[in-house]
Design a protein with these regions (language model features):
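Sec-dependent bacterial lipoprotein signal peptides
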Residues: 1-17
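Structural boundary/hinge residues at secondary-structure and domain interfaces
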Residues: 19-109, 113-131, 166-222, 227-324, ...
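Extracellular/lumenal glycan-associated surfaces
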Residues: 45-49, 108-114, 142, 147-150, ...
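A conserved glycine-rich beta-strand in the N-terminal activation segment of trypsin-fold
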Residues: 133-198, 378-460
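Short, exposed beta-strand/loop patches in secreted or surface proteins that constitute
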Residues: 134-139, 224-225, 358-363, 384-387, ...
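A cross-kingdom marker for long, charged
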Residues: 247-251, 259, 387, 467-492
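Active/binding-pocket-proximal capping segment
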Residues: 333-364, 409-413
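Flexible, glycine/threonine-enriched loop-and-boundary segments that flank and lead into catalytic domains
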Residues: 367-381
Length: 492
């Protein structure tokens, strides 16, 4: 369905202030009473413009200098609809967009609302239809359903009248129970539909049937978003049976890595994830286990017995500003420093021999650091540094950064004001199952400079409209059988 008329401006209502924050409760979207339980996706936008949160979200949108132009473009593409005059008086308190299935490239989509004023809504559709292909409507119960073809309207009507509704579906109710009804937007994705689509895609590529069931049965995906005076909150959940149940941990590496990171990703127990990936690959590629054994024989160590135990603890990946290229850092806490040193010394030797690159050992703070020099790499020169020390394995692309990792940084990420503020804004608890942090205020201009140095043209509009973005932090945590994903983007 091409996004037109009410659907376009419902989306703008979401951006501009379609209610957020506060409230409480977990009532289902009203459209769930008519949307068939077989639907693949439901996105419910709160268009109750009388909400007090409307002012907050309007203020948030106005921080972006390109917002007025975005509204004008949307209006022009929708028959010059005026939000205040045409849309606001017509829409009901909720607009829902429904994917009936994932067939035909995901185009089996309809939109629903209960018009505030039927005449105003009819006028809205007529005006929106003045340009491009028409948007058609029909009535299903108390709801007006819109689509770009009569076939889709008929498909929705048939599905709605012949089976149970989303409001009766337990997976849907469980997913919605975690989402505040006053949020600007709530979204639900039927897990079975997604899993089947993934399995079909993998099977089409030669994988065995039902490959993803090795991980578990995906029941649902759900998410919400809402704004406050500082920025945008978002929260999502993944329901899988059996539950993923990752072990929560208190990250300590932010207190050991330098401050000023543009990007920082924290993880734990990567051994479990790697085992799952290896199992899936083994099922997909009949010769994989044999080939892996041959590689292990050359390297002189076992992935399962030697490497994976080293990945059982906290790990971090970080990016720092540098010229001409950023500095990359990987630090993994290892239980056996001596084993880590042996494995990575052997691995670096094989890499150096196979790629014909230079290798040497540098003493840094009493630690032997292995330097790999890639003389044949395209400019600028590329060097990498590896070391195992004090229960950690470290990799970086900058010698000075390796020295900080070994001897201790001048200031740590834990003490970085931007990182501390991002954690506070996101409400991140002391223990999570992983998190990712981005310093957008410094990182986006750095990325623009890097792209420009590579010959790309960065529009001035892109620079202006990303300037209000300060930080973003996303973290995962357990909630019963759900894996929750929560976060906050700070906008000033």
């Amino acid at each position: 369905m091409r996004v037109r008329a009410a659907v376009v401006l419902a989306g703008l209502a979401l951006l501009a202030g379609g209610c957020g924050g506060g409230g409480g409760g977990n009532s289902l979207p009203a459209a769930a009473d008519v949307v068939p339980a077989s639907a693949a996706v439901l996105i419910s936008v709160n268009t109750d413009f009388s909400s007090a949160q409307w002012k907050r979200e309007l203020a948030l949108m106005r921080r972006f200098p390109g917002a007025p132009q975005l509204l004008r473009r949307a209006s022009e593409q929708s028959g010059n609809l005026d939000f205040g005059r045409d849309v606001k008086p017509a829409l009901g308190p909720e607009v829902d967009v429904v994917w009936l299935d994932f067939a035909r490239g995901g185009n089996d989509v309809v939109a629903l609302t209960q018009p505030k004023n039927k005449k105003r809504f009819a006028a809205l559709i007529r005006k929106g239809n003045s340009t491009g292909s028409p948007l058609l409507t029909t009535k299903v119960g108390d709801w007006t359903v819109a689509a770009d073809s009569r076939a889709k309207l008929a498909q929705f009507r048939q599905a709605s009248s012949s089976g149970k509704k989303l409001a009766d579906d337990q997976a849907f109710k469980d997913a919605m129970a975690k989402l505040d009804q006053s949020s600007a937007v709530r979204a639900y994705v039927a897990g079975g539909r997604v899993q089947k689509a993934l399995d079909d895609a993998f099977e089409g590529g030669g994988a065995p049937p039902h490959l993803t069931t090795e991980v578990g049965r995906l029941e649902s995906l759900s998410a919400k978003a809402e704004a406050d005076e500082k920025g945008l909150h978002f929260d999502g959940a993944i329901a899988i049976d059996p539950a993923l149940a990752p072990e929560p941990f208190a990250a300590t590496l932010p207190g050991e890595l330098p401050g000023g990171a543009l990007l920082y990703v924290s993880a734990n127990s990567l051994d479990d994830m790697t085992r799952t990936v290896l199992r899936l690959v083994s099922r997909s590629l009949p010769n994989f286990d044999t080939q892996l054994s041959q590689v292990e024989a050359v390297l002189g160590f076992s992935v399962q017995r030697d490497v994976l135990p080293l990945l059982a603890h906290e790990a971090a990946f970080a990016v720092y500003p540098a010229r001409p290229l950023p500095t990359f850092v990987v630090v993994i806490k290892v239980g056996d420093t001596a084993k880590a040193k042996r494995i990575f010394s052997r691995l670096s030797g094989v890499i150096a021999l196979g790629l014909n690159i230079n290798t040497k050992t540098l003493p840094v703070g009493g630690v032997d650091v292995t330097e790999l020099d890639f003389p044949h790499a395209p400019a600028p020169p590329v060097k990498t540094f590896f070391a195992a020390f004090e229960g950690k394995f470290a990799f970086t692309t900058d010698e000075a950064t390796m020295r900080q990792l070994i001897e201790g940084p001048h200031s740590t990420l834990e003490d970085d004001p931007a990182f501390a503020a991002a954690k506070k804004d996101a409400g991140m608890p002391g223990k999570t199952t992983g998190f990712a942090y981005a310093n957008l205020h410094d990182g986006l201009p750095f990325a623009f400079r890097l792209a420009a140095a590579g010959g790309s043209v960065i529009p001035a509009e892109a620079r202006r409209n990303t300037k209000p973005l300060r930080t973003a932090l996303v973290y995962t945590h357990e909630d019963g059988k759900l894996l929750r994903v929560s976060g906050f983007a700070t906008i000033k």
